[in-house]
């Protein structure tokens, strides 16, 4: 049997590193189909830290796509597992037959599914991508994204799978004995990416709570984002006093980010699609409820796991937030499907499906 090849087709360092380390640490030892990778981007020490994997790096999307297409044409039995498919050339290859449906297995990350960009280039490309998506052999995604995808592609097979968020299961009970009182701290957004709609979110928080809460906005990622960070800071200062606004422009190490999250009382995410699952998981683990847009289908995954969900359209106040905290504290977090290590079973099944080992 031909060994499955995993493709990280776009240079997204943070997510690519998370996936590679997860496969190296949790999957490679038990499956030959978890070891071969083709990655767009620089090595940056990943080969040395992922010794259980065989990783081939490419300078960009185009060179990677050309190599994948060549392999697909040379051996039609070769199967590929595409993680977060942000590579237009690969979609076009699937559409044109360069890659066959039986070779193409896709794990949806969120942004690669939705059509939110307004630029002309995207408007022209989206219909082609939609046609290509009808030809995918199988998609893997959250419950909400599977539901969203099935509305336009009902004949494509879908399987539940969660992004392998870096989590320490021993911290699942860390919030149970914490007392929350006084001024609330609200986390706005999960990164500095514009898709978080930070300014709209800050206005929504202010409309609900006024200048009575402290707002923390993590914007250390992506890099070279100074102009937008300053734009968000100035908009925030028009709404909140300086002591109640904390815009973080430096990237935080994982432990520092965890510490920051534990200081919050609420997460506020206004974007209308699934994204930021990693941050949501870490907040839920810490006993911190989240506010989601009703258009964000991840609320389906949360309710399936009996987790409280607040919406941006709800009338929010401190009593409602504290009640959501109490409800969250009563949940056995060791049973949540999208937490580590529970998502591992889904990955083992996904590998078997993509490799053709199970029907």
UniProtKB/Swiss-Prot annotation:
Q: Which residues form the signal peptide?
A: none
Could you confirm whether the keyword Magnesium appears in this record? no
Cite a single GO BP annotation.
Answer: fucosylation
* Pathway(s) the chain acts in: Bacterial outer membrane biogenesis; enterobacterial common antigen biosynthesis
For this UniProt entry, the molecular function terms from Gene Ontology, in alphabetical order, are: 4-acetamido-4,6-dideoxy-D-galactose transferase activity; fucosyltransferase activity
Membrane topology qualifier? Peripheral membrane protein
Q: What is its EC number?
A: 2.4.1.325
Q: What is its main location?
A: membrane
Record keywords:
Cell inner membrane, Cell membrane, Glycosyltransferase, Membrane, Transferase
Report the locations given in the UniProt record.
Cell inner membrane
Which GO cellular component term is one of those annotated? plasma membrane
Q: Tell me what reaction this enzyme catalyses.
A: beta-D-ManNAcA-(1->4)-alpha-D-GlcNAc-di-trans,octa-cis-undecaprenyl diphosphate + dTDP-4-acetamido-4,6-dideoxy-alpha-D-galactose = alpha-D-FucNAc4-(1->4)-beta-D-ManNAcA-(1->4)-D-GlcNAc-undecaprenyl diphosphate + dTDP + H(+)
Primary enzyme class: transferase
**InterPro entries this protein is in?**
WecF
Homology family: Belongs to the glycosyltransferase 56 family.
HAMAP family for this protein: WecF_RffT
Function of the molecule: Catalyzes the synthesis of Und-PP-GlcNAc-ManNAcA-Fuc4NAc (Lipid III), the third lipid-linked intermediate involved in ECA synthesis.
Name of the protein in its database record: TDP-N-acetylfucosamine:lipid II N-acetylfucosaminyltransferase
């Amino acid at each position: 049997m031909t060994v499955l090849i995993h493709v990280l087709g776009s240079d997204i360092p943070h997510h690519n590193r998370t996936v590679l380390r997860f496969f190296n640490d949790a999957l490679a030892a038990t499956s030959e189909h978890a070891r071969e990778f083709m990655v767009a981007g620089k090595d940056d020490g990943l080969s040395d830290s992922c010794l259980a994997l065989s990783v081939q790096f490419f300078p960009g999307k185009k060179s990677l796509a050309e190599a994948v297409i060549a392999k697909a044409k040379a051996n039609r039995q070769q199967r590929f597992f595409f993680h977060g498919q942000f590579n237009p050339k690969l979609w076009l290859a699937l559409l044109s037959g360069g890659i066959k449906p039986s070779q193409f297995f896709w794990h949806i990350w969120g942004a690669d599914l939705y059509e939110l960009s307004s630029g002309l280039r995207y408007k022209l490309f989206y219909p082609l991508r939609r046609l290509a998506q009808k030809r995918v052999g199988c998609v893997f995604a959250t419950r909400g994204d599977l539901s969203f995808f099935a509305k336009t592609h009902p004949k494509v097979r879908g399987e539940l799978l969660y992004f392998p968020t870096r989590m320490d299961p021993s911290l699942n009970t860390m919030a149970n004995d914490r007392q929350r009182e006084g001024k609330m701290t609200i986390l706005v957004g999960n990164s500095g990416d514009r898709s978080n709609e930070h300014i709209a979110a800050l206005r929504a928080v202010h409309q609900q709570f006024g200048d009575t809460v402290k707002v923390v906005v993590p914007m250390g990622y992506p890099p070279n984002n100074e102009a937008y960070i300053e734009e968000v800071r100035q908009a925030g200062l028009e709404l909140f006093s300086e002591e109640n606004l904390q815009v973080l422009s430096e990237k935080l190490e994982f432990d520092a980010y965890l510490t920051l999250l534990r200081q919050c009382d609420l997460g506020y995410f206004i974007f209308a699609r699934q994204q930021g699952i990693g941050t949501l998981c870490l907040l839920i683990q810490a006993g911190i409820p989240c506010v989601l847009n009703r258009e964000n289908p991840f609320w389906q995954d949360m309710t399936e796991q009996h987790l409280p969900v607040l919406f941006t359209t709800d009338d929010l106040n401190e009593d409602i937030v504290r009640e959501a905290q109490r409800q969250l504290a009563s949940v056995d977090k060791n049973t949540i499907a999208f937490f580590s290590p529970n998502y591992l079973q889904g990955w083992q099944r996904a590998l078997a499906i993509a490799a053709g080992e199970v029907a």
